[in-house]
Curated annotation (Swiss-Prot):
The keyword Ribosomal protein applies. PANTHER family: 40S RIBOSOMAL PROTEIN S14/30S RIBOSOMAL PROTEIN S11. Pfam families: Ribosomal_S11 (PF00411). It comes from the Eukaryota. GO terms for biological process: ribosomal small subunit assembly; translation. This is Small ribosomal subunit protein uS11z. Residues 130-149 are annotated as: Disordered.
């Protein structure tokens, strides 16, 4: 009779950097909140390497709900879970609205995405607004007399 082959214990591959206990590993969460969708894009500190990118539209079925706070919250929870798998424990936040010659106000998903990241156990470092501001832009849409309601 042949003996059963026993599996040899494999070394566990740990994703992410090796750190001491109680030390934070930072990533950068770029949150782009327009009025049509909310993007949460986590990179390393240099911004070159994408670790995870999830949008509100990936979490809900209806197009009208892509920019909703609920979709942003679901996306942020997914992002936080993936970050923890990769060993990221803290995030710097870069919040961006559409900007340019369009609105400089972040969309409805911005605040709920930030809250969901904080509530899911991620430590928040710096919060920065990186909305592009025109120095002297092309002409804004709406015509000479502006948008009439």
């Amino acid at each position: 009779m042949s003996r059963r082959k026993t599996r040899e214990p494999k070394e566990e591959n740990v994703l992410g950097p090796t750190v001491r206990e109680g030390e934070f590993v930072f990533g950068v969460a770029h949150i782009f909140a327009s009025f049509n969708d909310t993007f949460i894009h986590v990179t390393d500190l240099s911004g070159r390497e994408t670790l995870v990118r999830i949008t509100g539209g990936m979490k809900v079925k209806a197009d009208r709900d892509e920019s909703s706070p609920y979709a942003a919250m679901l996306a942020a929870q997914d992002v936080a879970q993936r970050c923890k798998e990769l060993g990221i424990t803290a995030l710097h936040i870069k919040l961006r609205a559409t900007g340019g010659n369009k609105t400089k106000t972040p969309g409805p998903g911005a605040q709920s995405a930030l809250r969901a990241l904080a509530r899911s156990g991620m430590k928040i470092g710096r919060i920065e607004d990186v909305t592009p501001v025109p120095t002297d832009s092309t002409r804004r849409k709406g015509g000479r007399r502006g948008r009439r309601l």
